[in-house]
């Protein structure tokens, strides 16, 4: 049992999970209960002095708590609960006067060596994912005229415990700035103000400093890694910024004695630095990281509140951060129906942006439209307002049912360059694929996702009945030809020569006269919602079998090859290890994974299936939980779809009537809007 005097500590969500023990709230006016084994306090705060004295008098050990090094999305001073804590029964990591549990962990070479590969993976994620202790700050945007020789000097909050117990104070901050200017006479000096100071909650050591010709105050709240990319050297007193600079590969000079100094990785200027180095010894950056982030810190799963690990927290923070950063500003999404605006709202609106669906907007920073059709309608107005056009479309794991039946999507994509199915220009997805360089962990994640999708038979719409091959298909090459919606934008912008289902089917038959061809009409065409029907007599002439209401994944599994114009079924077939022939230029063609009729010169890289899966399903789309209305990972979206009962498909050759479609629209709008 751990005793808690501090109301602030007592209010920390999931405290008992962090401490791995039950906790009891104590009163300063009563004796320490016998069942209490230790007293927890917050670092070296002055408020901890009395509980420490009480614990000492009662013969109870003291446990010191602090925020972990990857803490949360927003700042702690704004009330954001921690996702990570450190629990130290020796001292606390920022107290340089004596060894802490962290210092002892760093010196445990064997324990850290076992975690080196994990440390490298996490370090890579933090640097490339622009992650830090706090993760709500936007990325730093440099001026085009920026100098190349820039030195960063990091301020801290006045009387911060890490400064005091890092054997530093105002003198060290003054000496640091003086040294930075003297040692880098040709450089511009950037002074980074602490986020808590920017929020107006605290003051800093450089509060009186003013910008000069050489000194620039970085007074905006920006993410550390995005700022560090622009500097050549970093000066700190005891700030955690110094360690994050080491992760970014920058030389770091320390004027105090932070936890990462004294190991041979920093340029230490403190008068007592030799004594600290003698006590601490040497360590590599990976060993320091493994000890601090993987062993010293404790983590809570942001979604379940259960004990977790650094990688779960990093993945969640990266997901939330990417969602927020992609939607910064004042978004204007004009010309949408009530239905479309209702389903787009949770995908576009965040806690940090503004969103308008009106047909007129005067202060927007971007115009969001639905696909190519919306772009054509609003391009001129966006150009008149000098607004960038962002396109949205359905994602690749959409729903359990058809979009044309007005079922709300589980995933959408937001593309600021083009859109994935438009082969006439680059898209965000194409750029991601052209630059894909996966780490081993990312490759493993992609393969694990592929296996889960294959074993669960997930597809975009998750519709259809069981399918078995007819007996006459035995010993023949099985070719699946998926039909498409012929007036769909992917046909208009992704095809070159063959542009209709009939042309495709005829071409496949001509080139494969002895194959057993299965034609699978598009579900939207089958249910009467969209264009693309082939007369029955022509299908009978060109195909051996028509799989009407069959599950597309079961059709893929039973085929040897899939021949398509631009259908997503081709991508799904690649996941199942099938040979795919592309007669158009879908997003997955041109990377060395398909047999291609046409060439796209922009697609320069030869990809693995892991590259394609990772960028297409993990990075590019946004997944929103339909009831929580929060961003979720592709794995969580897949599990949600797996647990959702599959819907039957009602086949008709007539387009659904206007009354029926309005009725469907009303029902689904009410479900989305009012739950």
Curated annotation (Swiss-Prot):
The gene is kpsC. It is found in: Cytoplasm. Pfam families: Capsule_synth. Keywords: Capsule biogenesis/degradation, Cytoplasm, Polysaccharide transport, Sugar transport, Transport. To R.meliloti lipopolysaccharide processing protein LpsZ. This is Capsule polysaccharide export protein KpsC. The keyword Cytoplasm applies. It comes from Escherichia coli. GO terms for biological process: polysaccharide biosynthetic process; polysaccharide transport. Its main location: cytoplasm. One of its GO terms (cellular component) is cytoplasm. InterPro entries: Capsule_polysaccharide_synth. It comes from the Bacteria.
């Amino acid at each position: 049992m751990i005793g808690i005097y501090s109301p602030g500590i007592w209010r920390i969500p999931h405290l008992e999970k962090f401490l791995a023990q039950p906790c009891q709230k104590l009163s300063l006016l009563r004796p320490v209960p016998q069942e209490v084994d230790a007293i927890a306090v917050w670092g070296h705060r002055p408020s901890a002095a009395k509980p420490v004295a009480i614990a000492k008098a009662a013969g109870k050990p003291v446990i010191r708590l602090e925020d972990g090094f990857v803490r949360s999305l927003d700042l702690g001073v704004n009330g954001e609960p921690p996702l990570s804590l450190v629990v130290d029964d020796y001292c606390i990591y920022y107290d340089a006067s004596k060894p802490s549990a962290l210092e002892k962990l760093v010196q445990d070479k064997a324990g850290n060596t076992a975690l080196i590969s994990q440390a490298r993976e996490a370090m890579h994620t933090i640097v490339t994912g622009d992650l830090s202790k706090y993760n709500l700050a936007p990325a730093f945007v440099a001026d085009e005229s920026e100098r190349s020789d820039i030195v960063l000097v990091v301020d801290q909050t006045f009387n911060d415990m890490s400064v005091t117990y890092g054997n530093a104070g105002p003198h060290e901050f003054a000496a640091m700035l003086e040294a930075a200017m003297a040692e880098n006479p040709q450089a511009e000096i950037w002074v980074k103000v602490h986020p808590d100071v920017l929020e107006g909650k605290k003051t800093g050591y450089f509060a009186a400093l003013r910008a000069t010709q050489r000194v620039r105050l970085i007074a905006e709240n920006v993410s550390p890694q995005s700022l560090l990319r622009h500097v050549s050297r970093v000066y700190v007193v005891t700030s955690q910024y110094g360690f994050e600079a080491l992760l970014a590969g920058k030389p770091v000079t320390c004027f105090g004695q932070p936890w990462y100094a004294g190991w041979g990785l920093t340029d230490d200027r403190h008068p007592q630095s030799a004594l600290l180095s003698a006590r601490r010894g040497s360590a590599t950056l990976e060993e320091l990281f493994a000890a601090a982030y993987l062993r010293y810190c404790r983590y809570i799963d942001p979604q379940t509140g259960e004990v977790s690990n650094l990688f779960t927290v990093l993945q969640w923070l990266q997901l939330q951060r990417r969602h927020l950063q992609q939607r910064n500003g004042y978004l204007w999404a004009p010309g949408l129906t009530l239905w479309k605006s209702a389903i787009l709202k949770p995908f576009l609106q965040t806690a940090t942006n503004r969103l308008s669906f009106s047909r007129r907007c005067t202060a927007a920073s971007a115009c969001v439209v639905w696909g190519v059709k919306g772009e054509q309608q609003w391009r001129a107005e966006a150009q008149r307002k000098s607004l960038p056009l962002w396109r949205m479309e359905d994602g690749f794991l959409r729903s359990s049912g058809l979009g044309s039946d007005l079922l709300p999507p589980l995933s959408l994509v937001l593309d600021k360059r083009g859109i994935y199915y438009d082969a006439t220009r680059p898209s965000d997805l194409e750029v991601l694929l052209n630059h894909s360089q996966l780490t081993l962990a990312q490759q493993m994640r992609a393969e694990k996702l592929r296996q889960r999708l294959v074993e669960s038979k997930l597809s975009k719409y998750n519709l259809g009945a069981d399918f078995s091959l007819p007996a006459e298909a035995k010993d023949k090459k099985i070719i699946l030809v998926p039909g498409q919606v012929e007036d769909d934008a992917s046909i208009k912008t992704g095809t070159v020569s063959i542009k209709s289902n009939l042309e495709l089917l005829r071409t496949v038959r001509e080139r494969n006269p002895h194959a057993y061809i299965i034609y699978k009409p598009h579900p939207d065409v089958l249910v009467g919602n969209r264009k693309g029907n082939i007369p029955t007599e022509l299908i009978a002439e060109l195909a051996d079998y028509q799989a009407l209401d069959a599950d597309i994944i079961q059709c893929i599994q039973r085929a040897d090859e899939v021949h398509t114009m631009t259908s997503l079924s081709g991508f799904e077939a690649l996941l199942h290890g099938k040979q795919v022939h592309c007669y158009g230029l879908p997003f997955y063609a041109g990377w060395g994974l398909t047999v291609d009729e046409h060439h796209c010169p922009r697609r320069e890289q030869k990809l693995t299936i892991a590259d394609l899966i990772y960028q297409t399903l993990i990075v590019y789309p946004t997944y929103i939980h339909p009831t929580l209305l929060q961003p979720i990972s592709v794995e969580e979206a897949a599990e949600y779809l797996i647990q959702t009962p599959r819907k039957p498909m009602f086949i008709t050759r007539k387009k659904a009537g206007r009354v029926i479609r309005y009725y469907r629209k009303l029902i689904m709008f009410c479900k989305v809007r009012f739950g």
